[in-house]
Amino acid sequence: MEQYEKKGYLNSEFRLFHLTDQETKEVDYHYHDFDKITIFIRGKVNYMIEGRSYDLKPYDIVLVKQGDIHRLTVDNSCPYERIIVYISPNFMNAYQTDTYDLSYCFQKAAKEHSNVLRIPSFEKSSLFRSISQLEHSFTDGGYASELYRQVMFL
């Protein structure tokens, strides 16, 4: 069995990054000990997750469950822009009840054998507005800002 490198770290319940890279180095297969959601904005990217290949389109949502072996290949002829959310499994589990489960999207992705969601007109959706507000909340250092971010995320 091949050995894969664990990459990234998470020292909070969740973290959001908005990144744009003009040039991205090739990344070997790896895994994380947290869940990851990537909202692809622009670029030319192929994601390999657990042996399945996805050529991304703008505003695709990529779901990578903790422990999933994955890598991406980026065509550096154009900028690669995305929003990434790292989520602690403990955070997801803390909000699980009989009536709802925050990890449902990851479970459904596994069941349907597809780690990519395509939402028509994503930039017009309420999800897009919510993500934009959540992203903006990370610039606010006011009273209880971390709690505010958690509430927005939920």
Predicted features and spans:
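A hydrophobic/aromatic-rich effector-binding and dimerization subdomain
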Residues: 2-15, 73-138
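A generic structural signal for short coil/turn motifs at secondary-structure boundaries
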Residues: 49, 73, 142-143
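Amphipathic, well-ordered alpha-helical segments in soluble domains
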Residues: 36-39, 126-133, 152
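Glycine-/small-residue-rich active-site loops that bind phosphorylated ligands and cofactors
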Residues: 54, 77, 141
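All-alpha amphipathic helical-bundle segments outside canonical DNA-binding/catalytic cores
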Residues: 122, 138-152
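Generic protein-terminus/edge-of-domain signal
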Residues: 1-61, 68, 100-104, 111-115
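Short hydrophobic-aromatic micro-motifs
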Residues: 62-65, 85
